[in-house]
């Protein structure tokens, strides 16, 4: 269980708060809008109304006590940038800030963000791949060069074992798990025979994934 400070309760921030709550983390939610704060109260540990660009307000939250600080302010990049910078100045352990464009990400990373989330960009990429490739069932971007996909077993792999295929050496990707009837097995044995009833969880460089699985 992690302690999380979440600043900015627009649509993305609200959904993030709900997901963090479902995962069992302790969440302190902050927004300057009282209505947004009240809407999030049922699924956060605590919440406060306040201006995150005020150093005295942030200091009162004890930002260094949280494992992760999310900055998910929407519609006001200047506030997001100032908040990110102040969090780091006050000793925040790890700051994840929301960006809508690459230029915003560069400024955030230069001003204290340890990582940047692109909710719209990442969702767009997932939707583009998921709904134009019937054999791809899930897509998770790890960074600009790597991803994890859930994919149908290629026809030329069916009836053969994982060990026989020598997948990592020949194709440059790693099998993380196999999924059958909605259940995932991450204990991968070279003796597993692949067939059309399985899907594979595969990690690799985007170039290798595109080449082998036609993304």
Predicted regions located by residue number:
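Cytosolic regulatory regions of ion transport systems
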Residues: 1-215
């Amino acid at each position: 269980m992690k302690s999380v400070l979440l600043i900015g309760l627009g649509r993305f921030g609200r959904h993030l708060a709900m997901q963090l709550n479902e995962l069992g983390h302790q969440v302190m939610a902050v927004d300057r809008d009282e209505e947004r704060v009240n809407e999030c109260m049922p699924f956060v540990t605590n919440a406060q109304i306040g201006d995150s660009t005020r150093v005295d307000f942030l200091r009162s939250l004890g930002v260094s006590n949280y494992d992760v600080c999310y900055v998910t302010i929407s519609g006001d990049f200047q506030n997001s940038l100032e908040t990110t910078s102040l969090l780091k100045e006050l000793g925040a352990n790890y700051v994840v800030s929301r960006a809508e464009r690459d230029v915003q990400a560069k400024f955030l990373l230069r001003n204290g963000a340890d990582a940047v989330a692109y909710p719209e960009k990442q969702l767009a990429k997932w939707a583009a791949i998921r709904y134009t490739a019937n054999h791809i069932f899930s897509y998770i971007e790890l960074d600009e060069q790597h991803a994890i996909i859930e994919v149908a077993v290629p026809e030329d792999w069916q009836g053969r074992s994982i060990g026989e295929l020598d997948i990592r050496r020949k194709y440059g990707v790693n099998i993380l798990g196999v999924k059958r009837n909605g259940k995932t097995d991450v204990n991968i044995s070279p003796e597993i025979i692949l067939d059309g009833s399985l899907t594979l969880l595969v990690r690799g460089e985007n170039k290798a994934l595109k080449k082998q699985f036609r993304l």
